[in-house]
Regions:
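Short glycine-enriched loop/turn motifs at secondary-structure junctions
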Residues: 61-66, 98-99
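Short, charged/polar, Gly/Pro-enriched secondary-structure boundary elements
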Residues: 43-47, 112-115
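Core segments of cupin and vicinal oxygen chelate
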Residues: 1-46
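Short, charged/polar surface micro-motifs in flexible loops or helix N-caps
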Residues: 42-45, 56-58, 76
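Vicinal oxygen chelate
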Residues: 23-27, 34-37, 71-125
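A general structural signal for stabilizing positions within well-ordered secondary structure
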Residues: 14, 60, 106-109
């Protein structure tokens, strides 16, 4: 679960930019929060991301314990170019990892969380 500043902007990022689907969303008026679940496939058998928006909260201290989310992509360079066209902030340009390994890039969601993009055909087993 990640807490987001603006649920609509976050849904645009995860769904419109990264291509996830909004799987379900529910408002909890008594608790003054909304939960939205996004992912690439059905949540019964695939990983999903829970976005929590606490009504009236403008920002969060992200701390230092959480690093980032990671998503595999088929064409890292084309994906980054397309995300830039959509206004997504690329904070680490695509290229090989330091000291060898897969090709990666990092983008930033509207709340400031980092999402690592990993070119799947460069991952070594």
């Amino acid at each position: 679960m990640i807490r987001v500043n603006d649920l609509n902007e976050s849904l645009k990022f995860y769904c419109d930019a990264l291509g996830m689907k909004l799987l379900r969303k529910h408002d909890y008026p008594n608790g003054e929060f909304t939960l939205a679940f996004v992912g690439y496939e059905d949540e019964d058998s695939h990983t999903v991301v829970e976005l929590t928006h606490n009504w009236g909260t403008k920002s969060y201290d992200q701390g230092s314990a959480f690093g980032h989310l990671a998503v595999g992509v088929d064409d890292l360079y084309a994906t980054c170019a397309a995300l830039k066209e959509k206004g997504v902030k690329v904070v680490r340009e695509p290229g090989p990892m330091k000291f060898g390994g897969p090709h990666i890039a990092f983008v930033e969601d509207p709340t400031g969380y980092k999402v690592e993009l990993i070119q799947t055909n460069t991952v070594h087993s």
